[in-house]
Amino acid sequence: MATCSWAATTAAAAPPRPPARCRSRVAALRRTAAASAAAASCVLAEAPKGLKVEQADAVEPAAAAAARRDVGPDTVASIILGGGAGTRLFPLTRTRAKPAVPVGGCYRLIDIPMSNCINSKINKIYVLTQFNSQSLNRHIARTYNIGEGVGFGDGFVEVLAATQTTGESGKRWFQGTADAVRQFLWLFEDARLKRIENILILSGDHLYRMDYMDFVQKHVDKGADISVACVPVDESRASDFGLMKTDKNGRITDFLEKPKDESLKSMQLDMGTFGLRPEVADTCKYMASMGIYVFRTDILLRLLRGHYPTANDFGSEVIPMAAKDYNVQAYLFDGYWEDIGTIKSFFEANLALTDQSPNFYFYDPVKPIFTSPRFLPPTKVENCKVLNSIVSHGCFLTECSVDRSVIGVRSRLEPGVQLKDTMMMGADYYQTEAERFSELSDGKVPVGVGENTIIRNCIIDKNARIGKNVMIMNSQNVQEAERPLEGFYIRSGITVVLKNAVIPDGTVI
């Protein structure tokens, strides 16, 4: 699917009146632009109907082309929001921040926006954290360390943990996405960031691949104060997102956060007018916010400090209010994007990676996804049947069956194990053969999955110890259950085995 965007519009607020000596030149440019636009309209009127979008992109007013300014990544800084308490992803977030949750066998969610920044050549990156951030901090330090990890030139990656300072406002933790950014606005008055013209606000729990500089360039081309990345969605998912309506130039005219019933119906759009294929436009009649924004630096400072000093959230407060007074533009992203903030969406997105032609592809040689180098040996497979699965490095698979599953690093599957529709996150360490033999001799359960165990529709968190002859199948189709003392939860019918859990021999779940 190709990324779509639309024509530019001018800023909502009138620009400063130019000096008298410049007005004639401005008027001439406007006349040239008007003449060029009229010529473009004539060309479009005569063009074949099927070529409407292509011709519209090809015919650019001469004045606009002359005024176009290429944006360099050195003028952009990004802020990756480390997320809140992660209640929707619990129990995976019981001891870790959302961006630190493993994904795809050997990655973490934070690697997605970090890699998108690197591939977009944006090298000034802040990561804001608050809850359970220890493992996230460690992963960022190991992976994106300027001296030892991915190179950043004159850039940096800095983790900004929530802190309390003097004064009444400094005694609060982050109250939302906008409040988190507000508490660190002073950074953008630092001398080393004096060239930063636009600030990219990113989320740490999405799965997608995006060229952020294309997003920023469209933002500048349209003279936008704020730009919001958005995706087309159908009615079944629309109420889970902030929805927007735009005029013909892409300027946001209405924004509702997670509307229901009649309010939801009022947000329908004819998505075909934005260049989507008919089969997509017929089913996806809503434009949903991705929670990804570009702000002009001065506008961000003005809004969070002056205009909306008590607004805590970008999606539900800042963007809807700013759309009334500022030029807030929509950037339609027509590629794969998934908000994996719930157990169900997280599980389904991971299993979808095993498809023969997955919507998201970790193996792109041009725009790779980076992660921590672990220096592990190749996986060892002995007489196994593995179908449509991803097996990470450093694993031991012995006489087992794996079907449509994701196997994380250092995983161990013993003879007779059957895994289907399962995400196994792996382990943080190896046990020696002597340690395993000693534990088995004492009737204990070593790390990994024991002999003749059958597992279906399950997420197995790190370092889990699952014994012999265990059955994890949720045969009674229980949708929700909490058994922390027994080492598991059930969320949306999916069994989640806890990190470091011990499931004894013969257990049936």
Curated annotation (Swiss-Prot):
Chain segment of the transit peptide: 1-36
Known EC number: 2.7.7.27
Location(s) in or outside the cell: Plastid, Chloroplast
Gene Ontology annotations for the cellular component aspect, listed alphabetically: chloroplast
Pfam families: LbH_GLGC (PF25247), NTP_transferase (PF00483)
Induction, per UniProt: Induced by sucrose and glucose.
Gene3D superfamilies tied to this protein: Hexapeptide repeat proteins, Spore Coat Polysaccharide Biosynthesis Protein SpsA, Chain A
Superkingdom in the source lineage: Eukaryota
Listed SUPFAM superfamilies: Nucleotide-diphospho-sugar transferases, Trimeric LpxA-like enzymes
Keywords from the UniProt entry: Allosteric enzyme, ATP-binding, Chloroplast, Nucleotide-binding, Nucleotidyltransferase, Plastid, Starch biosynthesis, Transferase, Transit peptide
Catalytic activity reported: alpha-D-glucose 1-phosphate + ATP + H(+) = ADP-alpha-D-glucose + diphosphate
Expression sites (tissue/organ): Expressed in leaves and stems.
Regulation of activity: Activated by 3'phosphoglycerate, inhibited by orthophosphate. Allosteric regulation.
Any one GO BP annotation for this protein: starch biosynthetic process
A single MF term (Gene Ontology): glucose-1-phosphate adenylyltransferase activity
InterPro entries: ADP-Glc_PPase, ADP_Glu_pyroP_CS, NTP_transferase_dom, Nucleotide-diphossugar_trans, Trimer_LpxA-like_sf
Functional pathway: Glycan biosynthesis; starch biosynthesis
Coarse class of the protein's main subcellular location: plastid
Function: Involved in synthesis of starch. Catalyzes the synthesis of ADP-glucose, a molecule that serves as an activated glycosyl donor for alpha-1,4-glucan synthesis. Essential for starch synthesis in leaf chloroplasts.
Description of how the protein assembles with itself and partners: Heterotetramer composed of two small and two large subunits.
Family membership noted in the UniProt record: Belongs to the bacterial/plant glucose-1-phosphate adenylyltransferase family.
Protein's name in the database: Glucose-1-phosphate adenylyltransferase large subunit 4, chloroplastic/amyloplastic
Source species: Oryza sativa subsp. japonica (Rice)
Gene: AGPL4
